[in-house]
Amino acid sequence: MTDSQQDYQTIRCRSTADFLAALPQLAGFTATDSLFVVLFTGAQAERAVRFDLPSSEEPSESTRLLDLVCDILSEVGAAGDPDAAPALVISSALSFKEAGGTPWRRLARRIERRFRRERIGLRELCCIAPDGWVSYIESGAPQHGHPISEIEASPVALEALVNGD
């Protein structure tokens, strides 16, 4: 193996909880009040990009973020290519309880509308908060989220613990 080659571990995610358990390994770190955009080629995650969340969900606060994300996704060829559809994670310091429901729901809806307009598919759009997680695109998603324990009990999280990741 040359210095430029690396051993990559394949992580198989079968659910959103698995994907959220894998996010720290995919991104290389965790952060709250962030939007993670995970880029894909087919079923393979390629890289992750992190952005600070805006100070509020007001359109005037989030337009610049949406412009930047869409520009990047267009540059990498995600527009019009279902195999390149990204997965987005809103990592929130605001809990479901504090938000009175799903945190950052308005921003998520703006992302969905903008992606439709730009012809960018969505592999996943979800939120992780201190007291739960939810997929915004899951029909019938619980208003107060799924328990964090579902991520912690994910085979992906358990494997990371065993491997010391």
What are the roles of these predicted feature ranges?
Residues V38-T41:
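Short hydrophobic alpha-helical segments used for membrane anchoring or interfacial signaling
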